[in-house]
C-alpha cells in the first residue's frame, strides 16, 4: 500500500483531542500499520468540552478548568493506539485554547482558536506555526477538514483556513491535501440501519455533519484492518466518547451514531487522486504519488 524507498509521510491537522479518532482513525491506523510515518498536529486541548459521566465533572472549564490537561493524556493514549509517530500541539502546548461553540463566552478568551480564523489576530501566527511543521515533516499527504470544518465548529473552520494559509508559506510543496467527508447516500443508509440502544437518542445523518455529495469522494479507506485500533483510540477519549455494543458510539449528547465501515476524503489541494480502471476510487490516500521525493 505504501511501499517505496521512502515511507509515505502523512500529516493530520485537527482542532481538538478526539477529532483525529472520530474522523479518520481507521485511515491513520491503517497507514501506520502499512509502514507510513504519521504525524498528528492538534490545535487545542479541548478545554471547553463536556465530560461523560460524573467522576470527572470537576475538570470542566466552569469548575477547575483542568480538562485540557486530562485530555492531553487521552490524546497520547489514542495516538499510541493509532500508531502515530509524533504528536504536536500547534504553536506549542497551550498556544491556543478551545473556543467552544460559536457565540459562547469562551470564544472571547484571548487564546481562543477562533482568533486564528481568516482575518483574526492569530491567523498569521497559527499559519506560520503550521508551515514550520509542514517543512519539518515534509508530508506527502495532509489530512484535515473541509471549509465548514465538518459541522461548523469555529475551531474546525479555523483549522481549515490555517491549513490553506500555511501551504504557500511552507517551502515544502505538499503533494496532496485531503478533507475528510461523509458521502450523503452511504451515511444516510448507515443511520437508517442503526438500532438506537435504549437510553440513547436517535438522529438523522443530516444532523451530525461532514456530509458531502457522493461524487466528491476521491478516496475511500476501508476501516476493517484497523477497526480494533480505531476502537482503542476512541476508548482512550473516555471523557468524550462512549463506545456502545456493535459498531456504535455516542458523545456527551447521547446521540447514537454508527461507526462507518470506511472513511472518505475529497481533494482540497494538490495532486488529484487517480481512479481505477473501473472508475472506482482508490483506498490509499497516497495513491499515484511519488513517495521517493
From Swiss-Prot:
PANTHER family: 1D-MYO-INOSITOL 2-ACETAMIDO-2-DEOXY-ALPHA-D-GLUCOPYRANOSIDE DEACETYLASE (PTHR12993:SF26), N-ACETYLGLUCOSAMINYL-PHOSPHATIDYLINOSITOL DE-N-ACETYLASE-RELATED (PTHR12993). It catalyses: 1D-myo-inositol 2-acetamido-2-deoxy-alpha-D-glucopyranoside + H2O = 1D-myo-inositol 2-amino-2-deoxy-alpha-D-glucopyranoside + acetate. SUPFAM superfamilies: LmbE-like. Zn(2+) binds at residues 16, 19, 156. Transmembrane segments: none annotated. Binds 1 zinc ion per subunit. Signal peptide: none annotated. Its EC number is 3.5.1.103. The gene is mshB. It comes from the Bacteria. NCBIfam families: mycothiol_MshB. Belongs to the MshB deacetylase family. InterPro entries: GlcNAc_PI_deacetylase-related (IPR003737), LmbE-like_dom_sf (IPR024078), Mycothiol_biosynthesis_MshB (IPR017810). It is an enzyme of class 3 (hydrolase). It comes from Nakamurella multipartita (strain ATCC 700099 / DSM 44233 / CIP 104796 / JCM 9543 / NBRC 105858 / Y-104). This is 1D-myo-inositol 2-acetamido-2-deoxy-alpha-D-glucopyranoside deacetylase. GO terms for biological process: mycothiol biosynthetic process. One of its GO terms (molecular function) is N-acetylglucosaminylinositol deacetylase activity. Catalyzes the deacetylation of 1D-myo-inositol 2-acetamido-2-deoxy-alpha-D-glucopyranoside (GlcNAc-Ins) in the mycothiol biosynthesis pathway. Keywords: Hydrolase, Metal-binding, Zinc. Its cofactor is Zn(2+).
Amino acid at each position: 500500500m505504501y511501499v517505496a524507498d521512502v515511507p509515505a509521510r502523512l500529516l493530520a491537522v485537527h482542532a481538538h483531542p478526539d477529532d483525529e479518532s472520530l474522523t479518520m482513525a481507521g485511515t491513520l491506523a491503517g497507514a501506520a500499520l502499512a509502514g507510513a510515518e504519521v504525524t498528528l498536529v492538534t490545535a487545542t486541548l479541548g478545554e471547553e468540552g463536556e465530560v461523560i459521566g460524573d467522576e470527572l465533572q470537576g475538570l470542566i472549564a466552569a469548575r477547575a478548568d483542568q480538562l485540557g490537561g486530562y485530555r492531553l493524556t487521552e490524546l497520547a493514549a489514542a495516538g499510541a493506539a493509532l500508531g502515530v509517530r509524533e504528536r504536536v500541539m500547534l504553536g506549542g502546548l497551550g498556544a491556543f485554547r478551545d473556543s467552544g461553540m460559536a457565540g459562547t463566552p469562551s470564544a472571547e478568551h484571548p487564546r481562543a482558536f477562533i482568533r486564528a480564523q481568516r482575518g483574526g489576530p492569530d491567523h498569521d501566527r497559527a499559519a506560520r506555526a503550521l508551515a514550520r511543521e509542514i517543512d519539518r515533516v515534509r508530508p506527502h499527504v495532509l489530512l484535515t477538514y473541509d471549509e465548514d470544518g465538518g459541522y461548523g465548529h469555529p475551531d474546525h473552520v479555523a483549522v481549515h483556513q490555517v491549513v490553506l494559509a500555511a501551504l504557500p508559506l511552507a517551502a515544502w510543496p505538499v503533494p496532496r491535501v485531503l478533507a475528510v467527508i461523509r458521502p450523503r447516500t452511504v451515511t444516510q443508509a448507515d443511520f437508517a440501519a442503526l438500532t438506537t440502544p435504549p437510553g440513547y437518542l436517535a438522529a438523522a445523518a443530516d444532523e451530525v455533519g461532514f456530509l458531502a455529495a457522493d461524487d466528491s469522494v476521491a478516496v475511500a479507506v476501508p476501516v476493517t484492518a484497523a477497526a480494533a485500533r480505531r476502537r482503542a483510540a476512541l476508548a482512550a477519549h473516555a471523557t468524550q466518547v462512549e463506545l456502545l455494543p456493535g459498531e456504535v458510539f455516542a458523545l456527551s449528547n447521547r446521540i447514537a451514531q454508527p461507526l462507518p465501515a470506511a472513511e472518505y476524503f475529497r481533494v482540497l489541494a494538490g495532486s488529484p487522486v487517480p481512479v481505477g480502471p473501473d472508475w472506482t476510487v482508490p483506498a490509499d490516500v497516497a495513491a499515484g504519488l511519488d513517495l521517493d521525493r
